Amino acid sequence: MAKKGKKYQEAAQKVDSTKFYSVEEAIKLAKETSTVNFDASVEVAFRLGIDVRKNDQQIRGAVVLPNGTGKTQRVLVFAKGEKLKEAEAAGADFVGDSEYINKINQGWFDFDVIVATPDMMGEVGKLGRVLGPKGLMPNPKTGTVTMDVTKAVQEIKAGKVEYRAEKSGIVHAAIGKVSFDADKLVENFNTLKDVLAKAKPASSKGTYFKTVAVTTTMGPGIKIDPSEVRN
């Protein structure tokens, strides 16, 4: 295992690995312990009491964070006719149909999110083996397969983030940048937490929010007191 650098070691010394912090404390500490020379992302990890092998316990969705993510998302929209014009007017970076399918097949990935109208999914679905592993396949659960392309594009541009529980039941998501005021990050954190709480499967028994941690890009992990997020 590679040894962590000096900056990381110094940052890690500011974090008490035996302590559970309040949400506010953890986020302030995450900002203080960022070790990189760019505006790092602030990320959270919720370990949930779910079994994703069960169909009714697979958690996936999207939420618009009130203060955005600080990241500019490049949006590609697959649509036809008037929907192309709507997507363009809403601020989509790329709009089209078959020509972009051909470009993707040739290795083009200069975008972050795909939105598609339902009538385009027959064609877009053929890209499953290319888009699926990259997490780029549009999905109705995240609002990226829709006839309302205007709303979809505007929400993504406003700071919409997708979330999905991994095999271990962990949901990772970025809630902003180190440059954000701490209270803005706390507000984004609470918005995501509330959405995850509402998404709790009825069949999930026992503790739902098992562990919660916050970190920055390449920064140390900071544990949050689970009692602060449990309903």
From Swiss-Prot:
Extract the InterPro entries matched here.
Ribosom_uL1_bac-type, Ribosomal_uL1, Ribosomal_uL1-like, Ribosomal_uL1/biogenesis, Ribosomal_uL1_3-a/b-sand, Ribosomal_uL1_CS
Q: Where on the tree of life does the source sit, at the highest rank?
A: Bacteria
GO BP terms: regulation of translation; translation
A GO CC annotation given for this chain: large ribosomal subunit
Keyword annotations: Repressor, Ribonucleoprotein, Ribosomal protein, RNA-binding, rRNA-binding, Translation regulation, tRNA-binding
CDD domains the record matches:
Ribosomal_L1
Q: Which Gene3D superfamilies does the annotation name?
A: 3.30.190.20, 3.40.50.790
GO molecular function terms attached to this record:
rRNA binding; structural constituent of ribosome; tRNA binding
Asked if the keyword RNA-binding belongs to this entry, the reply reads yes
- rRNA-binding keyword on record: yes
Q: Which family does it belong to?
A: Belongs to the universal ribosomal protein uL1 family.
NCBIfam families, alphabetically? Answer: rplA_bact
Q: What does it do?
A: Binds directly to 23S rRNA. The L1 stalk is quite mobile in the ribosome, and is involved in E site tRNA release.
Quaternary assembly: Part of the 50S ribosomal subunit.
Q: Could you tell me what this protein is called?
A: Large ribosomal subunit protein uL1
Q: Which organism is it from?
A: Macrococcus caseolyticus (strain JCSC5402) (Macrococcoides caseolyticum)
